[in-house]
């Protein structure tokens, strides 16, 4: 109920603001940071529980038109304002850009960045992903399962931010403390880099003898 109430209030407040394109429902940063307002503006959209407007969904680009040009011009790096986040997103965008792929959530992420959009992210958790427990899931979703049953929170009053302002540090906090520790692509990359460093260390010791 709190999620729907939150959505109703923010859908109404930002119904005419084309820059705001999605309302997220999940929040995983309570142990890392406290907020005075009821939500902040993010460039990381979540598909666990979300809402949008007809005007925003009309911008959905399943064909990801102009993706390669945007990537090559550095526009994705510029949008996310953090190289680690942009590299991570590009790895998914590359896959979603395949003709045989139908990852709508990543195509929607591209639609948001293509239009320089923002997402509203609550500062209290409003949704759980129950799909982990009752249905087969992909490896990617399974990696996030430890965050699927966060305690749901209620709110009686919504405190709006004074202005629409994006702070990249919130997304960096989410990336480093949640995404980077759960996404199998990043975990595998970290393992590969660790093995490479270990091999390099052994070879250096061997050559020193």
Predicted feature descriptions by range:
Residues 2-209:
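An acidic/histidine-cluster motif and surrounding catalytic segment
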């Amino acid at each position: 109920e709190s999620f729907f109430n939150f959505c109703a209030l923010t859908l109404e407040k930002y119904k005419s603001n084309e820059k705001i394109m999605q309302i997220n429902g999940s929040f995983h940063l309570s142990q890392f940071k406290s907020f005075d307002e009821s939500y902040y503006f993010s460039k990381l959209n979540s598909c666990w529980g979300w809402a949008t407007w007809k005007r925003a969904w009309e911008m959905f680009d399943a064909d990801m038109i102009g993706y390669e040009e945007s990537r090559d011009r550095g526009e994705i790096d510029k949008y996310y304002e953090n190289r680690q986040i942009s590299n991570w997103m590009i790895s998914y965008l590359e896959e979603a850009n395949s003709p045989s792929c139908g990852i709508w959530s990543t195509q929607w992420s591209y639609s948001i960045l293509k239009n320089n959009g923002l997402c509203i992210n609550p500062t209290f958790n409003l949704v759980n992903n129950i799909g982990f427990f009752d249905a087969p899931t992909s490896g990617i979703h399974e990696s996030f399962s430890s965050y699927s049953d966060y305690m749901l929170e209620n709110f009686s009053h919504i405190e709006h931010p004074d202005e629409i302002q994006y702070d990249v540090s919130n997304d960096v906090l989410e990336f480093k403390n949640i995404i980077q520790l759960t996404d199998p692509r990043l975990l595998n990359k970290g393992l590969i880099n660790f093995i490479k460093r270990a091999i390099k260390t052994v070879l250096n010791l061997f050559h020193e003898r």
